[in-house]
Amino acid sequence: MIISKQCSNCSFDVVATQFVQWLQSYRQQQQQSGNHHVVDIILQKIGCGGDIEFIDINLWWSQCRTIDEGDAPHSVVRGDSPYAYITNVSDNEISDHLLVTTSQYNASMFRKLFRHIEVVPHAYDPLEVSVVDKVKEKKFDVITIGYDTADDHKGLTVARKVALDLSLRYVEVSNQCDNVGVNASTSQTQIQLADNMICIPFMTLTREDVYRLIAQSRFYLALSHTEGFGLPVLESMVAGTVPIYVDGHAFHEYAKGIPIPAYSDKRVDWYNYEYEDVVEVVKSAMSTSQSEYNELSMRVKEESRHYFHPDVVYRKLINIVNKNVKSNLF
C-alpha cells in the first residue's frame, strides 16, 4: 500500500507519518493474532497516486484529480483545507473519490466537489504523551504555532499585539520570524520579538521540541480566521495546555478550553473577531486561579486523550476506507 503526501517537513508529512507508524504496529498485532490478510508493505511517497493521499483538498483537486482518475481511481483523499477556493463546479465534475476530511466545517465546503465525504479528526501522536508528561515547569504564558499567509489567516499579527499589550511571556513557532538570531544557551535559532517574546522559525524544531514548548506554556492562543482542523490545538489539549480559541470553523467542533466570540459574515470560510474581545478573554484567562487552571487543564487533557486516541481515530479511518473502496486495503 502506498501512502502519499503533498510535502515533506510539513503538517501533512506529520499526520501521514503518524498514521504509517500506527499502521505498522497494527499490522504486527494482526499478524500475531493469526490474521495474515493485512497489508504487507507500506510505502510513503511525495505527490499524487497513493492509495491514501494526505493532501490539501484544493491542491488535490487542481493537480492530482486528473492523474488519479487514470492511475489511482480508487484512492482515498485524506485532507483538509481552511479555504473554499473552488467555485462554479458542474455536476459532471464531481469526483467519485472518497474524501475523508477532518471536520464538518471542511465537509460542508467541499460537498460540491465530492459525492462521498466522511469526517474523521486527526489523532494525537503517542510520542507527545511521553514528552509532555515529563514537563513540570511553565515558562510561557501563551504559545502559538502556524504557517501564516499574506492575509494573516493564522492571526499571528493579532497574537503578537495581544502579547505585547498584556506583557505576556510569549513564544511563537512560525514562518514569520525575521532577522533570525541564535540563542547561544540552547543553540536553537530564534528571534527576540520584544521583552519576554520570542519567535522560532517554523519546522526548525523536532517534534519532541515542539511538544515540550507546548507543555511549557499555560495557554495556546489560537486566533486563526479559518482552519480545516488545526493540529497544534489538538497537541495543546493533549499536553493540558489550555486553548484560548476562536469559536468558529473547525475549532467550534472540537476545541476545548476558553472560546473567543467570532462571527462569519460575507465569507463562509472566514471568521472575524474583535480585538477587544480577544484582550478581554486573554486577560480573564491570565487571572484564573491555580486550582481553577489545574482543573480545566486536566479536563481538557483527559477528554482529548480519549476522543483523539490513535486507536479510536485510525480504526475508524481504516473501517471507512475498507467499506468504501473496491477492495480492502487493510
Swiss-Prot record:
Task: Quote the EC number.
Answer: 2.4.-.-
The superkingdom of the source organism is Viruses
| Class in the EC hierarchy, top level | transferase
State any single GO MF term. glycosyltransferase activity
InterPro entries listed in its UniProt record: Glyco_trans_1
The alphabetical list of record keywords is: Glycosyltransferase, Transferase
Task: Tell me any Pfam family this protein matches.
Answer: Glycos_transf_1
- SS bond partners: none
**Would the keyword ATP-binding be found if you checked this record's keyword annotation?**
no
- Entry similarity comment: Belongs to the glycosyltransferase group 1 family. Glycosyltransferase 4 subfamily.
Protein known as: Putative glycosyltransferase ORF330
Q: Which organism is it from?
A: Acidianus filamentous virus 2 (isolate Italy/Pozzuoli)
